[in-house]
Amino acid sequence: MPYDQDSFSTLLGFLQASRKYSEFTLKCPICIYVPCQCFAVGFLKQSDQ
């Protein structure tokens, strides 16, 4: 199932990228201007606990 493998690796890549980006966002006031990034950061922080 090459399509499923591609989707899975794409999802993993997206999760890794969003995690790195959320770490940057935590140190940057940009989430004041982009609330959806604040929501993503909060979701990642909750899922870590």
From Swiss-Prot:
Protein name: Putative uncharacterized protein PNAS-138
